[in-house]
């Protein structure tokens, strides 16, 4: 989906929150120079890689062609500060791609779903009772509620980037219209896909 907005050949892609670098092969196959960034150095399985938090990237301003982050925004307490960092390190004309699972989607509570609809803390407590241990993605400690509306506001309000694409990531492209319907978009989107071009 990133390649829909231009060739990746010869481009430097920074994958922020890369974890096990599940997208490395696809980016490299498209000709990109791939660099993984993750807060957990033990999880960095590819090279080159940088151990760093996404909210404070040790990367120069305007230095990468594509800054990509998949399913990380909901795991940081200040999601839009995190997203601001992605814009900061992207060159003018480069792409910023942010995709995340929104809280009110069926999988917003991750492994505690669908009980997160009753609240993050009660869902985590229920999970603990059922499985005998807390969820990996604990509400308020490693999982925060992020909305589609907040992501669209952030993307549309940037003076230093133009929003090129916003759509439900796992639905057909024609489902973009869901994003115009408040309320419904929060439940039906599942995962919001945002692509911005740095000015």
Where are these regions (language model features)?
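Conserved SAM-binding loop
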Residues: 2-108, 194-198
